[in-house]
């Protein structure tokens, strides 16, 4: 939002310097991006009247002029401007003047003729282009000898504000003046709205066919206007200093009203309309040539203004060329409407262009402003272009309901940390136009029609805080005792998990929760993932249900950078659909190991990590829980090198080697090892129990069993452990043999059994019966003792 300080002062009676106003606005939340004067620095330029013009005797393109610059006599100046003529008033720089760029004016001779100064164009003064080839011609009543900076108010300050989306009420001079009044306590002078005399007979019927999209639409016909009328200099100046180029009087009036009070407007050529105006959704196949000469194909989610023949304009965005006013226009229709922000939002991006109107409508326009805007525009049209105004025609759809919000003074003090008197709070609310009503606890406020962001108590507290001034709230450092919170014995701290993974050689990574849909199909066999309505990009179209895809992508990035050993882990949320259709999110820890077990070094042989290496890492991570590894099939994993991690009969994760088919698809030289576990299961742990260390030596027995290949080592261990008693401290596999001496389809598995008593030294009489029992259990399960 760009505006001039001089225009602001017509509605806010403030005498603050521009620097102080800049600071005040920024501190209140209306960030000032830029503040600069209306013209660059120059001095010594006055208004002069050209009294005579004669051709230069020695130059075809030069003229010798005599001008009255208020010095008491005529000054001779040689001028080459094509539009110089007697009787005009122009800026004149006399000897001693300094123009932009530190260009100093001195008496000189041009082709033998004395020139005591220079007549100036807008370009030479650093002013906006007035579209004239030559001198900048001033109004006839411009006082001769007056400093041009004073006459044109060139020391005026131009502010550019960065208005946040929730403060659409500040996208006008009226809104900013209201804000300045609240911040400084100065008088707020609202623009005077005069009811136009009804002297015309024509009306423009209006029908709202989409009441949820258009809450109000007002039209007024003005007949017999002069479309060729010139926009007054004062209006041109205010528009230009607000960053809007003057086009024509009728268009300029619409833009002026929008900037002045905040209501976007549109002007139709009444003679180009057919029947009633309809505010409706676009229909399939409809197109529109817009004012920017761009023809667009309309979608059915677009609100349009149409007549009986077709679409006239994109509602709230841009008018159509077919119904636009021109120099030949005689009768016009003024339009002022309230469109729901939701129907306008996103249309600028959809059609590839925006406007000042759409910028305001998509943020929210005051829904009680339309009649005032029509009256103000009518007044200006009659004043500048003449004509006869007809009656207003209004159609109404669904308008927002004013919300009531309570403000508790105790809550205000708690949040802001300062006790603001109730009288001051009431004054601030009144200056903001919020019309407070006193209650037992504080105030009740009905959100005004121009404030869409006042919905809850916190919004009112924010308003009080920024107007009171956050810099005025004293620093008050609160003190409090730090209470040590005891962590339950059955839960390990989160940082311990991070430390454990780092100690095992893993590096933490963070990947996107938005992933490629193909990853979900490949690594989770998820044919129906949670899809995003507005994805950032095609490769971020769905929410992940597994961490494996992100870890594989990180591996690819590292391999592309010549890293041949990668150990990474991530703790993050995954997302899935519950049985009731609701979205479920769970936290998981995922890990990936690729390459050698240890970094390459001279003292030992290098080998690549295998399933048992990463299984050991998982066991270490879950060392405080009783877990089993059960062979499984998983879409991401090798069919023979994958296992589910089971605890208390519940699957809490999986571990294994990436499936061979994904190696080729994702261009991986060798298979990485991966795991993924529910984080809640990792953080849970059993109680640590004290166990006395036996002072008696253990006894070891080695048993070799011949068993079918189909029988797993784990099956054998489960049988042996089931037959063991309290003397058995450990049963584990230490060797596997296949080959000569064994029948086909059989293998030999060697198991060590460690026995130890806590009270006595074990004897053969105690050991041998137990070993026999273990052998018997194994034999019954299909494994015989190897002889």
UniProtKB/Swiss-Prot annotation:
What reaction does this enzyme carry out catalytically?
tRNA(Phe) + L-phenylalanine + ATP = L-phenylalanyl-tRNA(Phe) + AMP + diphosphate + H(+)
Query: Can you say where in the cell this protein is located?
Result: Cytoplasm
Q: What class of enzyme is it?
A: ligase
* The record's free-text note on cofactor binding: Binds 2 magnesium ions per tetramer.
- An example of a Gene Ontology BP annotation on this entry? phenylalanyl-tRNA aminoacylation
Annotated Mg(2+) binding lies at: 453, 459, 462-463
- Where does the record place the FDX-ACB domain? 694-786
Q: Which keywords describe this protein according to UniProt?
A: Aminoacyl-tRNA synthetase, ATP-binding, Cytoplasm, Ligase, Magnesium, Metal-binding, Nucleotide-binding, Protein biosynthesis, RNA-binding, tRNA-binding
Give a Gene Ontology cellular component term annotated to this protein. phenylalanine-tRNA ligase complex
Q: Which residues form the tRNA-binding domain?
A: 39-149
Give residue ranges for domain B5. Answer: 400-475
Where this protein primarily resides, as one coarse class? cytoplasm
Q: Does the keyword tRNA-binding apply?
A: yes
Which co-factors does it depend on? Answer: Mg(2+)
Q: Recorded GO terms, molecular function?
A: ATP binding; magnesium ion binding; phenylalanine-tRNA ligase activity; tRNA binding
CDD domains associated with the record: PheRS_beta_core, tRNA_bind_bactPheRS
Q: Where are the transmembrane segments?
A: none
Q: What is its EC number?
A: 6.1.1.20
Q: Which family does it belong to?
A: Belongs to the phenylalanyl-tRNA synthetase beta subunit family. Type 1 subfamily.
Record HAMAP family: Phe_tRNA_synth_beta1
Q: How does it assemble?
A: Tetramer of two alpha and two beta subunits.
Q: Which NCBIfam families match?
A: pheT_bact (TIGR00472), YtpR (NF045760)
Q: Which protein, by its recorded name, is this?
A: Phenylalanine--tRNA ligase beta subunit
